[in-house]
């Protein structure tokens, strides 16, 4: 968006250098990307009057001009422009002057004739070629009004000006207009903003006698209105309007078209002007296009329309693509006498889809896509009527025809002074806050500590109280906010927290065990979101996912770890060991925020160690995975218990729940054979722990224990049990009956096969006995040992 300082000052009186103004605007969050200075490199540029013209005696394409530039005598200038003529008021660069590009004007002799200056085109004074009016694109510029010779040409051209180029974010559509920028500037400088004149003198003709409108689908077109201006005279628009449009990046065409574009830039409200005589009826109908409907747009291109496109029709034939471009046969031409002015609100999504599909990006479509200010729709049409009456001699018919609702012009938002001060971190009074909103043009009412702010429709970026707080900070000035040190409830000496320390220890432990850290997306496909979940909870689905594969927040880290292993195995890396410390998510219904829980998970497949001259390779199995989990418990100074269990996606006979203080906090086990087959994996083992629960367990101090002074005794037992009996059950029975002298019970062998029944297995357990107070006797050990054996027998175990 290009903002002319001269144009801006017609609404807001500011006495500020443009670079200071640009810096101040940038500090509020609207970035000024560049400043275009039309006075740069220009010197001695004046207005001249061509008194006479004579053909050059030695050059067919040159003319000798006598030009009054406000000095005692006219100067002679040799000019080659095809459109130069006597009686013209032109731009002259006098001797000693400079033009953009480093051009210096000197006395010269052209084909034997002296020339003391240069009659200039707009391109030569810095106007881009694509913006020069067509009648001047191949020649010099000629003023349409009388200007005193010798006047500063930059002043006469309204180019004694600087233009700021805004790099706007999508939320600040209000700054896509001069008036929106004027409101912002007025707030920054705490000065009033003057709105332009919109009141025209209406004739006795009634608009509803001239035209009628109908909307077929108000979901796509909430509001459509039209006014009629008759008997316009097509001519060039005044120079001030042409130059303002040029500085805004728009090429002037004629007064009627220029007024439409001028109001677009002024209000940010796109208008469309139809030649009333060419519409083909007295009725305008707004509808969605029919399948395979066609129309020719202003650029003479035949357009294939789709059913989602919105079109303006004369009741039968499309005459414009709504919000994008008009049709060729209803455009304003040199023959136009009567004009219908359209002001409307169109669905932003529909306009965006249509403009992208047709590759028709315009100033109008870009504003409709972002949403327009309902408060300005009718006002912009009235402004256009006033300008047509003033600069095109038009007669404005009474009233307007419309259908639909404009909607609310303001949105009320309540905000408390205490909330503002708590958020920005320093004290502002209610009067200070109210003053800022008044500066922004927001009406406010006060009830004790609460301000009700009426946010106008032009500020679509403000919808909640936090947005209002941002406005307060912006206009007050981020640079004025006092510097303070942060206040902490608990001040540390720069050490890691307990959780941070434990996290680092666990990561180091896992990496020491040969696992590499993985970091995966928190999103999975919906079908796998509940896989391996320890608890049955509702999932959290994205409203508009980028892909089906990333549509739901995960409830386990295992699915993505399996993907990572499968990816590696498919690329001949068969020995993979990974862990991940990340968040999982559980829904709490529509009214509550979801739970975010940190989990620790791991996955192992292939060989744990490879062949070496000192050792043989070791294939990963259940006990390797369980050993890593035990190592985690050891590092955290806690003790896990294991219980056989079944979890969706894991092998039913090789899976165990991990318990801490009687509560299930995770699992360890082998992937289900079907899962391994689906991913083309060998035996693969996983573990998953609720890391938050591990961190919540308070760990006491480590107590010193003296090295035992007395020898211990170990006994091995072999038990025949049913194959379904878990070894953990036997170990628990042993501990229950081992008394104080049983130090440890460890399974060291499991046998199934020859000499065993099909439904039986043999489990060998080593029992370690120790008395820290005295030497153990056989009698004492035997008594405890026999009690253990009897307990095992009562549970169906047979001693081998």
Curated annotation (Swiss-Prot):
Catalytic activity reported:
tRNA(Phe) + L-phenylalanine + ATP = L-phenylalanyl-tRNA(Phe) + AMP + diphosphate + H(+)
Give residue ranges for domain B5.
Answer: 408-483
The record places domain FDX-ACB at 708-800
**Gene Ontology terms: biological process:** phenylalanyl-tRNA aminoacylation
Q: Which PROSITE patterns match?
A: B5, FDX_ACB, TRBD
EC annotation from Swiss-Prot or TrEMBL: 6.1.1.20
InterPro entries per the record?
Answer: aa-tRNA-synth_II/BPL/LPL (IPR045864), B3/B4_tRNA-bd (IPR005146), DNA-bd_dom_put_sf (IPR009061), Fdx_antiC-bd (IPR005121), Fdx_antiC-bd_sf (IPR036690), NA-bd_OB-fold (IPR012340), Phe-tRNA-ligase_IIc_bsu (IPR045060), Phe-tRNA-ligase_IIc_bsu_bact (IPR004532)
One GO cellular component term: phenylalanine-tRNA ligase complex
Q: State whether it acts alone or in a complex, and with which partners, per the record.
A: Tetramer of two alpha and two beta subunits.
- Return the similarity comment: Belongs to the phenylalanyl-tRNA synthetase beta subunit family. Type 1 subfamily.
Which protein, by its recorded name, is this? Phenylalanine--tRNA ligase beta subunit
Species of origin: Staphylococcus saprophyticus subsp. saprophyticus (strain ATCC 15305 / DSM 20229 / NCIMB 8711 / NCTC 7292 / S-41)
């Amino acid at each position: 968006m290009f903002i002319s300082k001269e144009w801006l000052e017609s609404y807001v009186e500011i006495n500020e250098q443009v670079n200071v103004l640009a810096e101040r605007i940038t500090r509020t969050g609207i970035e000024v990307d560049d400043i275009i200075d039309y006075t740069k490199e220009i010197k001695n540029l004046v207005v001249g009057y061509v008194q006479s013209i004579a053909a050059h005696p030695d050059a067919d394409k040159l003319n000798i001009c006598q030009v009054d530039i406000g000095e005692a005598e006219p100067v002679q200038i040799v000019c080659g422009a095809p459109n130069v003529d006597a009686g013209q008021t032109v731009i002259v660069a006098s001797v000693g002057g400079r033009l953009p590009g480093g051009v210096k004007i000197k006395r010269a002799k052209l084909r034997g004739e002296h020339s003391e200056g240069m009659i200039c085109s707009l391109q030569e004074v810095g106007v881009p070629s694509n913006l020069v009016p067509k009648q001047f694109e191949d020649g010099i510029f000629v003023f349409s009004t009388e200007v005193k010779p010798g006047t500063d040409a930059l002043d006469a051209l309204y180019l004694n000006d600087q233009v700021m180029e805004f790099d706007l974010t999508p939320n600040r559509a209000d700054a896509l207009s001069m008036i929106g920028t004027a409101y912002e500037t007025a707030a920054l400088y705490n000065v009033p903003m003057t709105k332009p004149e919109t009141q025209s003198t209406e004739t006795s003709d009634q608009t509803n006698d001239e035209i009628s409108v109908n909307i077929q689908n108000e979901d796509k077109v909430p509001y459509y209105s039209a006014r009629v201006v008759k008997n316009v005279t097509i001519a060039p628009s005044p120079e001030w309007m042409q130059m303002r449009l040029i500085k805004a990046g728009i090429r002037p065409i004629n007064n009627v078209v220029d007024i439409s574009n001028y109001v677009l830039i002024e209000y940010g409200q796109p208008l469309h002007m139809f030649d009333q005589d060419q519409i083909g009826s007295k009725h305008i109908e707004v509808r969605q296009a029919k399948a395979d409907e066609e129309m020719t747009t202003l650029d003479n291109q035949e357009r294939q329309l789709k059913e989602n496109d919105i079109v303006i029709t004369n009741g039968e034939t499309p005459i414009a693509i709504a919000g994008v471009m008009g049709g060729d046969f209803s455009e304003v031409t040199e023959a136009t006498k009567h004009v219908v002015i359209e002001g409307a609100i169109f669905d932003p999504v529909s306009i965006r889809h249509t403009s992208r599909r047709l590759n028709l990006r315009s100033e109008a479509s870009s504003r409709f896509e972002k949403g327009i200010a309902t408060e300005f729709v009718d006002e912009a049409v009235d402004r256009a009527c006033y300008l047509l009456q003033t600069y095109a001699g038009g007669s404005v018919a009474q009233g307007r025809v419309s259908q639909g609702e404009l909607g609310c012009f303001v949105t009320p938002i309540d905000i408390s002074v205490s909330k503002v001060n708590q958020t920005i971190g320093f004290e502002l009074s209610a009067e200070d806050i109210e003053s800022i909103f008044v500066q922004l043009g927001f009406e406010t009412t006060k009830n004790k500590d609460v301000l009700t702010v009426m946010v106008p429709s032009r500020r679509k970026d403000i919808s909640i109280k936090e947005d209002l707080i941002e406005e307060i900070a912006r206009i007050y000035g981020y640079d004025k906010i006092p510097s303070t040190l942060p206040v902490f409830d608990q001040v540390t000496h720069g050490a890691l927290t307990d959780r941070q320390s434990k996290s680092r220890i666990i990561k180091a432990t896992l990496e020491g065990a040969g696992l590499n850290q993985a970091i995966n997306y928190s999103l999975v496909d919906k079908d796998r979101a509940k896989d391996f979940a320890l608890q049955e909870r509702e999932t959290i689905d994205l409203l508009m996912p980028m892909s089906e594969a990333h549509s739901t927040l995960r409830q386990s880290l295992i699915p993505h770890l399996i993907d990572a292993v499968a990816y590696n195995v498919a690329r001949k890396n068969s020995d993979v060991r990974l862990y991940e410390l990340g968040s999982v998510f559980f829904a709490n219904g529509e009214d509550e925020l979801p739970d975010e829980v940190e989990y620790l998970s791991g996955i192992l497949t292939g060989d744990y160690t490879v062949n070496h001259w000192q050792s043989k390779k070791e294939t990963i199995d259940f006990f390797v995975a369980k050993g890593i989990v035990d190592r985690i418990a050891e590092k955290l100074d806690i003790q896990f218990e294991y219980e056989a269990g079944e979890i969706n996606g894991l092998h039913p006979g090789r899976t165990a729940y991990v318990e801490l203080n009687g509560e299930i906090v995770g699992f360890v086990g082998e992937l289900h054979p079907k899962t391994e087959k689906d991913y083309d994996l060998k035996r693969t083992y996983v573990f998953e722990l609720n890391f938050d629960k591990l961190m919540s367990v308070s760990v006491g101090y480590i107590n010193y224990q003296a090295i035992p002074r007395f020898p211990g005794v170990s006994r091995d037992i072999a038990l025949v049990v049913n194959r379904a009996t878990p070894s953990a059950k036997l170990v628990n029975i042993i501990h229950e009956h081992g008394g104080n002298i049983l130090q440890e019970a460890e399974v060291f062998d499991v046998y199934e096969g020859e000499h065993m029944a099909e439904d039986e297995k043999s489990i060998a357990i080593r029992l370690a006995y120790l008395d820290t107070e005295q030497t153990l006797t056989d009698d004492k050990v035997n008594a405890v040992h026999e009690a253990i054996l009897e307990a095992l027998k009562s549970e169906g175990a047979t001693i081998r």
